[in-house]
Amino acid sequence: MIPSGQKTAKDFYGNQARGWVQHMMTNVWNYTAPGEHPSWGATNTGGAWLCDHLWEHFAYTGDMEYLARVYPALKGASQFFLSTMIREPKRGYLVTAPSSSPENTFYENGVAVSICMGPTMDTQLVRELFQQTAEAAATLGYSDQEAFCDSLKSAVKELAPHKISEEGYLMEWLEDYEETDIHHRHIS
């Protein structure tokens, strides 16, 4: 999947994109590109989500050989986000863009839309990915990764914080948008 994700990173995000990306769907042919509908296909944190499972396996087993084998996947996914995230213009947060909160939509100026900057799901997945990658390098004693890990730790501090909406729930987007379907089965 990683070689396919490296190609997708370059093809869809340009030559500055490093590492690899996995959007929210894949198949046995290592499909990593965006899906055909923006309400779910624009979400580019599938690789971060998969890496969370790699980390959880290590956290459960403590298998250092396994961690050394999967570290390149963690690092590559982190490199992708470090090289492609942008500054949200209103508050200066480091965000994924374009993206979406999968399959959910909100109203903006009376129109149902799905594309946004920095949905909460992405922010949490990237936060965990950066923290887990830095912890993996430290656990493995990879002192040559110190500068890279410092950049991950710095980036974590620039991600948007979780915010509570006017109605008392975790906001799904950076803005407290009105959801088109308040009973939607997916939440951030």
Residue ranges and their predicted role:
Residues Q22:
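A motif-centric feature for acidic-aromatic and gly/ser/thr-rich catalytic loops and repeats
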Residues M1-K7, N15, T26-M64, A68, ...:
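Active-site core of glycosidic bond-cleaving carbohydrate-active enzymes
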